[in-house]
Amino acid sequence: MFNSCEVAPVDDTVSHMKRVRDAWVKVNYGSNYVALTKSGIYVLEESDGSGSSVLDSSYCFVNYSMIDLDGTYKSTTDPEIAKMHLGTYSDTVYWAPSIWRIADYTQNDGARELLKMMKVGGKVKAIVPPELSGVTYPKDYKTSVVTSNKEFSVNMIYEISLEKTVKNIEQYEFDLLKNYAEKYWNGIDSTVKGFYFLKLKENPVESDTIVNGTSINVYYSGHVIDGITDNFLFDTNIADTARMYRRYNKDKSYTGLSVTYYKDPEDAISNNSLVDGFARAISEFKYGEEGVAFFSSSHGYKAEGSGKTIPAYSPLVFYIKTQDK
């Protein structure tokens, strides 16, 4: 536990937060910290990485924890810390590095400054002033927002581990998909850019073709492709699958998902409230068939991801079954 100098502030000015920072460092580190930057960041500890440096265009895969000066954890990517300190651990959360960017100003000023000091494999522990926990955009940046709301109103300790960087996130996803196809599906080719489909069970009865505009029930399980396990289940409407992955929820109704069938993929996409890749896959089926579709985030949840189960820029795989006629 840290020796805290963080008290209820008389005011929230920059100068007050600086005094709190200075006092905390003096008590806990003395002069044995690494550096004090011009912007007011105290770099407390660092471990140099041996990999590539962070470029303005880099997509940075980062494990992190945010801790206030009292030693209270506020957020983390570490499941053990979430379990021990935050009480937020859940098997339904996808625990993996976050993707932080510099070029598109989705990352706050303090984190961006720290990342630019780092190389892959490196770690840093630093106190970031609250005024650097927002995003300051350059004057020529095309946004209606000049400075975002600050993430924190007090000084915050950032513990950051830079796991890897990627220059081209689209190509990174394509490589994951290609490797996935080769590892599990005999190297099948994509049918459109970033989208793969394979029929696993075919219905030979021609009369079981689904008519355009028909509402049908489909059953599915959705998983994240990460190049490691490729098996994290983020959603299913099949009770046995939920049980197998220890995701069963007694309060959930495991029934078919009603979708409107269209043979043309673009019609299927535009007439259903589904991610593009899932809707595109439905257009490939007849009644009583099963298949697998996997695709890049451009056909899925894109740069935003979805909640705590689907990270940003995540390729996904769906196992899908259509109802019998």
Predicted regions and their residues:
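Cross-family detector of peptidyl-prolyl cis-trans isomerase
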Residues: 5-325
